[in-house]
Amino acid sequence: MITFDHVSHVFPNGTTALDDVSLHVEPHTTTVLLGTSGSGKTTLMRMVNRMLSPTSGRVIVRGQNVADIDPVKLRRSIGYVLQDAGLFPHRTIVDNIATVPRLEGASRRESAKRALELMDLVGLDRGLAKRYPAQLSGGQRQRVGVARALANEADILLMDEPFGALDPLVRADLQRELRDLRDRVGTTILFVTHDLDEAFMLGDQIAVLQTGGVLAQVGTSENLVTNPANDFVASFVGSSGQRRLSMKSTPAGTLISDPDGRPLGLLPEGELR
């Protein structure tokens, strides 16, 4: 679905943001770009929709080099969810969600019908349809953001730290709902985060980037914990030397804890990635 083929990017000031990154994202899966600030996560994501172009290498989406696709057409075929949701404050919730269908030529009635269906899909009460973003909680606004991202029936969803500003309980709920939504709809998700717990919860595969835009390792959560590729990955996942994460089977699934016994995440039974 998405392939980064030996992608590098150097900013005009000479700073290397990405250094020869190759990565493949399978259809209907979630790939998490995990790393510290300045590791190139968002830069890599922005190349999918041609917001940035590689200095060298290629980005392939749905079998085509994005350099050969009209950028407006490409961007309208992809859904986006950002940390601040990016909603129009002067528009109602239903109008926010209906933005893309309206741009694509759908009637107001058709767009509103689609928006209400998407509200159902992401767990938003239809009674909120005529409210404005400022009248919603942070978690509700993010649900609106997800609904709007799906409004154009996009098969690819780009998510840049969408839950980072939310409180832990709301964040955990949205993570579970996103995973369930992906399974129901079959969307391909590229998800940026610096949070290990979130990466383990959501990622079918996790791509760890380190400073300088170097792809340190790609694998499942189990791979990262049990077989880190280098000292950076070992340190990042807390498995350097004797500081190893633990995995314990429970009736609810596999519980991953840090070396001090603090739980990092729970992978439901059969979903150890």
Language model: regions and residue ranges:
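Helix-to-loop junction immediately C-terminal to a conserved catalytic motif
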Residues: 49
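ABC ATPase NBD coupling module
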Residues: 65-79, 103-105, 109
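Short helical segment in ABC ATPase nucleotide-binding domains corresponding to the A-loop/adjacent helical element
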Residues: 94-102, 112, 116
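Conserved ABC ATPase "signature" region
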Residues: 109-127
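ABC ATPase C-loop
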Residues: 128, 149-150
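Conserved ABC ATPase signature
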Residues: 132-136, 140-142
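Hydrophobic anchor residue at the start of the ABC signature
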Residues: 146
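A short, proline-enriched helix->beta-strand linker immediately N-terminal to the Walker B motif
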Residues: 151-155
